[in-house]
Swiss-Prot record:
Record Pfam families: ATP_bind_3, TilS_C
Matching InterPro entries: Lysidine-tRNA-synth_C (IPR012796), Rossmann-like_a/b/a_fold (IPR014729), TilS/TtcA_N (IPR011063), tRNA_Ile_lys_synt (IPR012094), tRNA_Ile_lys_synt_N (IPR012795)
UniProt organism field: Staphylococcus aureus (strain COL)
Alphabetized UniProt keyword annotations: ATP-binding, Cytoplasm, Ligase, Nucleotide-binding, tRNA processing
Location (main, coarse): cytoplasm
Record comment regarding domains: The N-terminal region contains the highly conserved SGGXDS motif, predicted to be a P-loop motif involved in ATP binding.
Location in the cell: Cytoplasm
Protein name (record): tRNA(Ile)-lysidine synthase
Gene, per the UniProt record: tilS
Length: 431
């Protein structure tokens, strides 16, 4: 049984995840024998999930085996009682906790590569699992031989080796191992695929499960193309404020993307900047219908902290205003520089004193201002509509009134002609 040893070097500290099953024990045997000169140091990690009674016996067996072969061994016992009590998917919970511990130990050991015993049959099983449960469209279809984790790499040297070859190797060299009885229980989906579905396909001479590997290769190439296209789109069209985590993108440019690419773009943005994961395809599709509607403004709640705002031609992700304090009314009695919500007001000393005190407030129903250069008045609300000002900006924008309570400025959109040089309003942070 030949390992693919391209994933580590002769001066590497390699770590093997050993369950005591036939796959990992055969991998360990090969590393101790035919591949003993391919690394600098070898360490074993073993996880006791604490679910089966045989777990204690397996851990003791591995301790004795590693002591006999002078291998450092670290064992972790997981507490999965919470998942058992709530009837959650214990396999998924165990995997998450297992890899959290692997991350921790690889850092503690300052090791280079973690080896796992995933083999060809595991690959085929995973491909089928992801196709059948709908997780194939936004993930790679199976395992990569080499993948990156936090500060180290995971390598799968048995990925081209079949289960049949592993069994033959074990029988030839009488390698000790433990059989996990739960692997025979078809109530677990992966077991059902492994024990029932794949053998049924193999019995049909016109079908070959191995063709799934060609599908994986094609699928993963398309996946990489989508990832690249999403990054290109983000670089070209997305504006992001790191401090406030305010994100803005052209609504039209986003709507022009195919749905598959839209999902990847949002996956990238929401996971990277907002730590939001696993939003369903169905939810995304509902959003896309709203994004492409003719409605000029609306909002979608992401979480209790984040919201998507659609404002005319922009798609915006921003913090909710809940809990934020905004000025509603402010009195200015003399020239100077002032901050009102997210705006900076520069009141020059040349502004006629008869206009003081100034009142700065947010909009009110029925607000109007005198048009510059012609007779008549215009509603502030109509100005907002004409300038396509988003609702939440309207709620914060400063409206300046003189001593007689006449509107002489509306944010950075309007200043009365006679005082234009002496009241300058800009968004706070703008140059």
């Amino acid at each position: 049984m030949q390992l693919n040893s391209n994933g580590w070097h002769v001066d590497d500290h390699i770590v093997v995840a050993v369950s005591t099953g036939i796959d990992s024990m055969c991998l360990l045997y090969q590393l101790l024998n035919d591949y003993k000169d391919s690394y600098r140091k070898l360490t074993c990690l073993h996880v006791n999930h604490g679910v089966r009674s045989a777990s204690i016996e397996e851990a003791r067996f591995l301790e004795a085996y590693c002591e006999r072969h002078h291998i450092d061994l670290h064992i972790k016992k997981l507490d999965l009682s919470h998942s058992l009590d709530r009837n959650n998917s214990i396999q998924n919970e165990a995997r998450i906790k297992r890899y959290e511990w692997f991350d921790e130990m690889m850092n503690v050991l300052e090791a280079d590569v973690l080896l796992t015993a995933h083999h060809l049959d595991d690959q085929l099983e995973t491909i089928m699992y992801r196709i059948f449960n709908g997780k194939s469209t936004r993930n790679k279809l199976g395992f990569d031989e080499l993948s990156k984790r936090k500060g180290y790499q995971i390598y799968r040297p048995l990925l081209a080796v079949s289960k049949k070859e592993i069994k033959q190797f074990q029988e030839r060299y009488h390698i000790p191992y433990f059989e996990d009885e739960s692997n025979k229980d078809n109530k677990y989906v992966r077991n059902d695929i492994r024990n029932r579905i794949i053998p049924a396909i193999d019995e049909n001479n016109q079908l070959k499960v191995s063709h799934l590997l060609k599908l994986k290769q094609w699928h993963d190439e398309q996946y990489d193309i989508l990832q690249y296209s999403a990054k290109q789109f983000i670089q070209e069209f997305v504006k992001f404020d790191e401090q406030s985590k305010y994100l803005e993108v052209s609504r039209q440019a986003f709507n022009n993307l195919p749905n598959s690419l839209k999902m990847v773009v949002l996956d990238c943005l929401l996971s990277k900047y907002y730590e939001l994961f696993n939003i369903s395809a169905k939810t995304y599709e509902e959003w896309f219908k709203q994004f492409s509607s003719k409605k000029a403004q609306f909002s979608i709640n992401l979480t209790d902290k984040w919201i998507i705002q659609i404002a005319y031609g922009k798609l915006i992700i921003m913090a909710k205003n809940n809990g934020d304090t905004y000025f509603r009314v402010q009195t200015i009695k003399k020239p100077g520089n002032y901050i009102f919500n997210k705006y900076r007001l520069e009141i020059h000393s040349n502004l006629p004193k008869c206009l003081f005190p100034l009142t700065v407030r947010t909009r009110q129903s029925g607000d109007t201002f005198k048009l510059n250069g012609r007779d008549g008045y215009k509603k502030v609300n109509r100005l907002f509509i004409d300038c396509k000002v988003p609702q939440w900006v309207r709620d914060q924008m400063p409206i300046v009134l003189d001593k007689q309570q006449r509107i002489i400025a509306v944010g950075d959109l309007y200043q009365q002609q006679t005082i234009k040089k002496w009241i300058i309003i800009s968004k706070n942070g703008d140059e």
